[in-house]
Amino acid sequence: MPPRLRVSADCTSRIARRIAHRAYATGADPTLRTALFFPGHGVQRKGMLGPWLEAFPNTCKPFVEEMDSILGYKLSEIIEDGPISMLDKTQNAQPAIMATSVMILRVLEKEFGFDTDKRINVTLGHSLGEYAALVAAGYLDFPFALKIVRRRGEVMAECTRKAKEESGETFGMMALVCEPEQLDALTAAVNEWLEFNAEGTRDDSSSLPPIQQVTLANKNSKNQIVLSGSFKRIRELLTHIREFGGHDPRAVELKSRSAFHSPIMRPAFDYMKRVMTPEVVRWPGKMPTVSNVTGMPFDSADNLRKNLSRQAIDTVLWWDSIKYLHEQAGTKRWLGLGPGKVGRNLVSKEVGRSGAKGGGVWSISEPREVEETMRGLDETEAEARN
């Protein structure tokens, strides 16, 4: 009689994860009831660590010390003491936001017994937030993710500096807001001006120098898109679509003074391609993570490495990601962790703050929000079971 095959618990867990990822790749619906999401650039604020350090020193103090040690400088002092002009620098703001978001998750896990692996079914993050999402889902180690976010931020800052120096223009991002029923037509008018082809890829416009290009950086919600590039060129685009396209969207300059998700960030894309080697990605992760570039879950380690790199220059399909989870994957509960409420507001635009039994949208940016949020999750999970 052949010897009985012994399978370790760890091996069983890995097999289960592969099955889950295979279900995604084949279009099966594993019902991703609870999503964990993280914010992107622009939500940083001076002093955002302080309330957490005061409320949960046993968890947050070691975490902050680890953050500073990994980076090799006192980012915590910049976050707490400023000046805000120093915190707003891309190379400081991005690791600060990412680390603060992960720290809040660690507080839930260590102080409140929150079992991320059991209670969260899928993660996602808006732009920069994708790095925290990949850490939470187990694809990237926190120290590695923090280091590359810092270095990527340095490269992005240098891209912006060179573009300004070469052109004498100001670069950044601008949100266009319209009525939901007008968004498709507005996007089509923008794409026509940007010389996009029918598949949504850049054609003849790619022959322009990067500093002369404007790109569609984000599809954020049912009534908002974001443009990236020089403000001079963005205003030319707005004038064109208002005069000839019949559209008059509300235009809002974003806090960023860099043209993220545009061709001038090509060096950041090149940097990410170099550092995202096969050994840095743990595959499969603990749960699926939705890609900004495709609006669908990463389906392989190679896909993750490629699209996390491309995210620096490609459109962030945030609205597509939310629609996929809401309409196809069965997501009912949405938990946002990190500074600010921008992420929650964008999610709520699509799915509503509450509604279906067992559903809701919550976010935690301050310690006082933890207990109420945990109660809401507990109650809706109980509702879903009944």
Predicted regions and their residues:
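N-terminal mitochondrial targeting presequence
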Residues: 1-33
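A short, flexible low-complexity segment enriched in Lys/Arg and Gly/Pro that occurs
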Residues: 11-22, 99-103, 311-318
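FabD-like malonyl-/acyl-CoA
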Residues: 22-196, 333-386
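Alpha/beta catalytic cores of group-transfer enzymes, especially the acyltransferase/condensing modules
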Residues: 42-43, 137-311
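Conserved active-site and cofactor/substrate-binding residues in soluble primary-metabolism enzymes
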Residues: 47, 58, 62, 92, ...
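A generic secondary-structure signal
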Residues: 107-111, 240, 324, 328
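Acyltransferase
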Residues: 247-337, 341-348, 352-371, 379-386
